[in-house]
């Protein structure tokens, strides 16, 4: 993820208020907002109180909500995700940020069609977009392995959310996002937002360029 040197950031302690598990290894951590202002698409750096290990997470919640949320996948070799999984309401997080320039420009909000392409927990900033900007024209393509990785898909308009599963059948598309996109009709008013692993972003960007989408209409955020 890129840091935006123009961001106004701070470090503070925020109390955890809730944790909800979406699968065995993916959960949403909710904590006090503490007055933090952010733009949907930005990320914060999170770690436990008095712990040196920290990690970047896109904000999952909407900009008008009175709390902050992050979507976390437990990674076996990831110290921070393992620590966060063991948190309980009442524990404190050290939060630094926000950072980054990834997001939807205000002048594009209702004048463009927004195509969100995510892999795994890369859905996080798009969840924030949809929560923050009711009424925008959007379509989500969410690439996952299994159907149970369609994290809180009920929060999206079912006519606008398409699940692409690589390991099992899906009501939408069986196969990776990159298998479906070549047949997707591109229109001149579309902006493409990519968020997820580096391989997905590289392959999707290549597909879009082959479809004559200008580079300035492809916005990317790499998850690692």
What are these regions (language model features)?
Residues 8, 79-224:
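FNR/FR-type flavoprotein reductase catalytic core
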Residues 2-91, 96:
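Ferredoxin-reductase
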